């Protein structure tokens, strides 16, 4: 018997437990709700960590380059700020926000100095401040100072939060919304900001979560289990994945927006992205001869014709990506086996294989 069971006030007193008055059907219903909440937390933390790893690796690849004649000033500003490291903000730090912070620290190359938290009661986050994470209550300050801001507040708090930070979010900042009840279009109106990544989660009745949801009490413990990593993959076929492939489209376009800031030629940006996603993986082989991305994978033919070889990609409105089909949507539909390779990259990333980029000594780390 676990020690925490003996400490429970209802130990060996089933009539006093919360579920005692519930019928069998009601107990099944509450168990399903708990399972979905756990699955949402695990998926949300895993996908956020994968996104930060990819963005960090891409930034480091570009910042390590030294031959962009139009990007010296932008590069100087980025390197001057936090030595070029990706700055992460978490707005709202309840149970989910705290699990997200721990996941980012353990599953990415981010250090505590890279993460800031704004919450109404920062004094309750001593476990985070002891790690060196800045915790305060100033939503406007947080929004104005980070590269990626994770929204982890309650839906009921979103309007008040939006009114506080509206107009303070830099164009280059990506708002990663984990407020699942609010669509991206509405969030864009609230924030007057278009760089929004919002994963849309769905959990079907016939899925493996019921067998896995008690695997670990925290996302970090759960994501040590390979089966859990497998089912959180966003690159599974429709009906099995907990998040649609549209999320990865938003991720890819948001990563490419960073190359716009440095005025990196579009061909070179795609080349660096291919290096990260299709490069050597510590000798582990994925699918043979995967189809690589090209500039045409991300923009239409008329846009390609307007770009010179030295031109960067245009700035992508991420909220529009979530609402309509893009050239990347078509590219994925034409090359379905590509998802197998991306699923491999995702699994290796979660297993902490150096499949994306070794960032030691890069970007100030």
Predicted regions and their residues:
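NAD(P)+-binding Rossmann beta1-loop-alpha1 motif at the extreme N-terminus of oxidoreductases
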Residues: 2-130, 136-137, 141, 257, ...
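Hydrophobic packing residues within well-ordered alpha-helices of enzyme cores
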Residues: 100, 128, 161-165, 187-188
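Conserved beta-strand segments of alpha/beta enzyme cores
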Residues: 114, 134, 174, 195-197
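Rossmann-fold dinucleotide-binding core
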Residues: 177-258, 262
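Interdomain hinge/lid region at the active-site interface
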Residues: 275-365
